Amino acid sequence: YVVNYGTAGSLNKNISGLIEVSKFYQRDMDVRGLGFQLGQTPFENDLFVQLDKNGYSCGTGDSFVMTSPDLVTDIVDMEAYSYAKFCKINKLNFICFKFISDNADDDAGKDWSKAFKKGAKEFSLFFQKEYEGIKI
């Protein structure tokens, strides 16, 4: 298994705490001017990576989100899409958990700093309990 844990900003005020993510978009891929959809990498068929489970959607990009992005997902981060895509291509099991650290707004930077350690502790306790014995 490849496990991704990290913090994320929520674009949905009803999402908080530690969540599992199952759908991944590349939120800052924008070549609509060439006829592709927002989030679509040119000459690739898939607009997103979907795991075989239920969970939230995540838009990954190269920026810390402080305003609503054009490609709207449940949460935003800066790394999960690349892990999900790598694992899909290489047929590796992948699970992804995010701790909601902020609401991807003007206060995101301050909120993230406060939530970072709390999220790591919650994930550690959760993972030890739920995935005892899993080989990573």
At which residue positions do the language-model features occur?
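Glycine-rich phosphate- or other oxyanion-binding loops that anchor nucleotides, phosphorylated ligands
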Residues: 1-136
